[in-house]
UniProtKB/Swiss-Prot annotation:
Xref: PANTHER family: UREASE ACCESSORY PROTEIN D (PTHR33643:SF1)
Family according to the record: Belongs to the UreD family.
This protein's name: Urease accessory protein UreD
Quaternary context: UreD, UreF and UreG form a complex that acts as a GTP-hydrolysis-dependent molecular chaperone, activating the urease apoprotein by helping to assemble the nickel containing metallocenter of UreC. The UreE protein probably delivers the nickel.
Signal peptide per UniProt: none
Domain of life: Bacteria
Keywords, in A-Z order: Chaperone, Cytoplasm, Nickel insertion
Protein species of origin: Deinococcus radiodurans (strain ATCC 13939 / DSM 20539 / JCM 16871 / CCUG 27074 / LMG 4051 / NBRC 15346 / NCIMB 9279 / VKM B-1422 / R1)
Primary location: cytoplasm
HAMAP family, per the entry: UreD
InterPro entries to which the protein is assigned, alphabetical: UreD
Cellular compartment(s): Cytoplasm
Any GO CC annotation of this UniProt entry: cytoplasm
One term of GO molecular function: nickel cation binding
Amino acid sequence: MTTLGTPVSLGRRTRTGRLELEFGVRHGQTALLRDLQKAPLMVVRPFRLPCGTLMVFIVNPTGGVLGGDHSEIHVEAGAGTRVLILTQSATRVQPSPGGEWATQELHFHVGVGARLEYYPERTLPFAGSRFRQHLRADLGAGAEFGLLETLASGRVQMGERLAWADYRSEVSVYAAQERVYLDRQHFRPGPHSRAPGVLGGNDYFASGVWVAGDSAAGRPAAESPTTAPGWASGLSAGGAVWARGVAATGPALDHAARQLREQVRHDLFGAAPLVLRR
């Protein structure tokens, strides 16, 4: 028991959130069959989009993640399902005066012929914060997967840029138990972060990957989905379409990212544009 005057160790985790979601097909439609929610992670009622995809929002009602916080998200998209997962707001990574890491683990399993897409809101690391994320997606035969994440250099409107202590992210995608994509990012701001050829004058960054299962019909078109300045895209050795971009402002990045996302989804998945309600 902690009493007044008893110091609380800054090194221990302050919160551990867990979210488990299982989707399946019921009466010919994708449905959320099971959910386990441990605060501060939770979901709101699913929405069905006009295209038939089931959309779910992940919510963290707190003011952000703190050093020592840990969250785990596990999603099972059963055979033939169509699932879209979004987050309600930006992930605000609070300062960590004691040097503790805020960590997040995500594991997606996409069943035979299913499609799972994850497009979270922006990650916003505050000055002095430390954030580490690991995301893994395992795809069954003919499964499709899409991911697009964005990162800000800090609280730009307050004049705070590249002041965080450390940011690390690893994304891996496996199809038929073979790794088709691996992306490791490690940002530790330093005196040369703003140098030409590194970040230049840009404050917003994006990275994405899309995998189309067994079908390669749309890959040539999807390999170069955008000609927007500050963006690059290509095809991994395993057949995954990847993209990465930078922009000076958030709206500019988001506009280009939406265009790219819909172009890749059309070319690779043959999917209709997403009509999102927030």
